[in-house]
């Protein structure tokens, strides 16, 4: 488990990096730009929201594969020894550094391979109201799941990441579930020493 001292230290690190080492853009510009991307995808895929979800996830995955390098360079954190520690780093550092939010970690499985992140606030969803035809199948912020999947994979954690609920869809909270499938082995590509 993660001690209270370690948890506070991670939170302080995330806040310090957010305040002093992160270039910031206007929140409204960020939110509206993301909204424009989602709206354009809905138009491009002729309101096939499953395809929009897949595209957002894929975009997020590609971002996550690169974002992890920036995160590790800024924090210089060592490899996490378990998923509990990883969840604390995600919540208290990564989300704080890149989105200035700190999701709550909850709903751990008994064997500690699955947990939920509860987003009390979601900067991607500000100023957003989903149309009725999108409320059942569009995961508006699905890019976040892709970012988590991509970044976790780059640190050798094969995880499934998905939305369970979203306030935009009329749910009481926004919840992202993370399930560890397996720890990947560091392997040297064929033909390289």
Curated annotation (Swiss-Prot):
Q: Which InterPro entries match?
A: Bet3, NO_sig/Golgi_transp_ligand-bd, TRAPP_component
Q: Where is the lipid attached (S-palmitoyl cysteine)?
A: 80
Q: Does the keyword GTP-binding apply?
A: no
Q: Where in the cell is it found?
A: Golgi apparatus, cis-Golgi network; Endoplasmic reticulum; Preautophagosomal structure
Q: Which GO terms describe its cellular component?
A: cis-Golgi network membrane; cytosol; endoplasmic reticulum; phagophore assembly site; TRAPP complex; TRAPPI protein complex; TRAPPII protein complex; TRAPPIII protein complex
**Record key words, sorted:** Autophagy, Endoplasmic reticulum, ER-Golgi transport, Golgi apparatus, Lipoprotein, Palmitate, Transport
Keyword Transport tagged:
yes
Q: Name one Pfam family in it.
A: TRAPP
GO BP field: cellular response to nitrogen starvation; cytoplasm to vacuole targeting by the Cvt pathway; endoplasmic reticulum to Golgi vesicle-mediated transport; intra-Golgi vesicle-mediated transport; macroautophagy; retrograde transport, endosome to Golgi
- Write out the function statement from the record: Component of the TRAPP I, TRAPP II and TRAPP III complexes which act as guanine nucleotide exchange factors (GEF) for YPT1. TRAPP I plays a key role in the late stages of endoplasmic reticulum to Golgi traffic. TRAPP II plays a role in intra-Golgi transport. TRAPP III plays a role in autophagosome formation. Required for sporulation. Has a role late in meiosis following DNA replication.
Q: What more does the record tell us?
A: Present with 2370 molecules/cell in log phase SD medium.
Q: Which family does it belong to?
A: Belongs to the TRAPP small subunits family. BET3 subfamily.
Q: Tell me, how does this one assemble?
A: Part of the multisubunit TRAPP (transport protein particle) I complex composed of BET3, BET5, TRS20, TRS23, TRS31 and TRS33. Part of the multisubunit TRAPP (transport protein particle) II complex composed of BET3, BET5, TRS20, TRS23, TRS31, TRS33, TRS65, TRS85, TRS120 and TRS130. Part of the multisubunit TRAPP (transport protein particle) III complex composed of BET3, BET5, TRS20, TRS23, TRS31, TRS33 and TRS85.
**Name of the protein in question:** Trafficking protein particle complex subunit BET3
